[in-house]
Regions:
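Extended acidic/charged loop-beta regions that coordinate divalent cations
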Residues: 11-61, 101-106, 110
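Short, conserved beta-strand segments within well-ordered enzyme catalytic domains
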Residues: 8, 54, 145
């Protein structure tokens, strides 16, 4: 980066340390570490209602109240605030914007008439975001269902990452529906981990059909996949049925 640039860095990420030492530009660090310029305190997890945590920027304090669920979104929120600070926006204004934030296809919660809860996280899927969504699902009460599409563009890491998600999903949900060639690895790993209620389909339409046949009042349903899977096309049908 040029000396006139600004780098916004998660100081809690050990992989970043060597990079920080080489930077000659303006630096804004964020995280839970005492060394962070923008620091967050203890995070309270409110399940489907989101999360909250205090933050400190120099001598200024504020409280973040994310409406989007998932502890994995805390780092994203901190990065978003840090970027706004880098642009000269006041902390209180940056936090206000974030506290009101919603994004289509990103951890959006919908409540159906029969008590079914739909978590629409269809916009995209990386190993970290899928793991975060599954960890949220694991914490919720009720029968937990996940319909997952494959994670694209992972290169040589693809097999390993899909297998890792297979292990995690087996421990996070009661019913698992999978779509996409790479999801065979999730299927096999989930089965190996003892998960019997896992199904792998050639098309997302078939996966949705099976899911709807099994759906009961009070179920919690997570949809997540890469952009190439276009799982958002299933949302209207699901909304009509719940």
């Amino acid at each position: 980066l040029a000396t006139t640039a600004t780098a916004v860095v998660n100081i809690d990420d050990e992989r970043i340390a060597p990079v920080i030492e080489e930077l000659t530009c303006r630096l804004i660090t964020f995280g839970s570490s005492k060394a962070a310029m923008l620091k967050h305190g203890p995070v309270k997890n409110h399940g489907l209602e989101g999360s909250s945590f205090p933050i400190n920027w120099h001598d200024t304090q504020a409280n973040v109240k994310l409406q989007l669920p998932g502890i994995h979104l805390v780092d994203n929120a901190m990065a978003a605030i840090a970027v706004q600070l880098a642009m000269g926006i006041e902390l209180k204004d940056a936090v206000k914007t974030l506290n009101e934030a919603h994004a289509k296809g990103r951890m959006l919660v919908r409540h159906g008439k029969n008590g079914v809860v739909l978590i629409d996280d269809t916009y995209n899927a990386s190993p970290a975001s899928v793991a975060g969504a599954l960890n949220l699902l694991k914490e919720l009460k009720g029968r937990r269902i996940a319909l997952l599409g494959e994670m694209a563009e992972l290169g040589t890491r693809s097999a390993t990452e899909h297998q890792r998600i297979g292990t995690l999903s087996a421990r996070s949900c009661d019913l698992l529906y999978l779509v996409g060639e790479q999801c065979q690895l999730i299927f096999e790993e989930a089965k190996k981990d003892g998960h019997m209620n896992v199904f792998w389909f050639g098309t997302k339409e078939l996966a949705l059909k099976k899911l709807l046949e099994e759906l009961r009042p009070g179920d919690i349903v997570l949809l997540k996949g890469s952009r190439s899977q276009e799982l958002e096309s299933l949302i209207p049908e699901l909304e009509r049925k719940i």
